[in-house]
């Protein structure tokens, strides 16, 4: 199902991020005022894919022309998550999160964190449903107009590792 991303996926990662953001976050980043920063996002994906501590999993569409979903994680955090809007409601975000949490568990982690835009109501409902809890920490997002991000944490149920 999911596979590990390669440098060949960089543009498709950016394109999926754009599609998901434009559908879910237009109220935060109105495109007429804050156009999607395609070049900056592409540069960030280059850094993410080059980071030896991070793993990015992707799910191809059935024609392997575009990505349906991605999740990036490290030993202790879920860094990036997106599902193409055409596939919302199919449980792919849950599968991606659970896959990342399992990998963190195997690496010896007992808890995980993530940051989410406070105004990303759809994502926050999912995190709440999956047992993530807000820590009370906040920070400005790196992208203009720098909306507030909130931190979540979740215990990882120990396995046999």
Features from the language model and the residues they span:
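Conserved beta-strand-loop-alpha-helix junction that forms the acyl-donor binding cleft
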Residues: 88, 114-124, 140-147
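A short beta-loop-alpha structural element at the N-terminal edge
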Residues: 1-15
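Conserved acetyl-CoA pyrophosphate-binding loop and the N-cap/start of the following alpha-helix
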Residues: 87, 91-99
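Conserved beta-hairpin
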Residues: 53-69
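Conserved GNAT-fold acetyl-CoA-binding loop/helix
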Residues: 18-45
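A short helix-loop-beta-strand connector motif used in the catalytic cores of GNAT acetyltransferases and
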Residues: 42-58, 77
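Conserved GNAT acetyl-CoA-binding A-motif
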Residues: 104-115
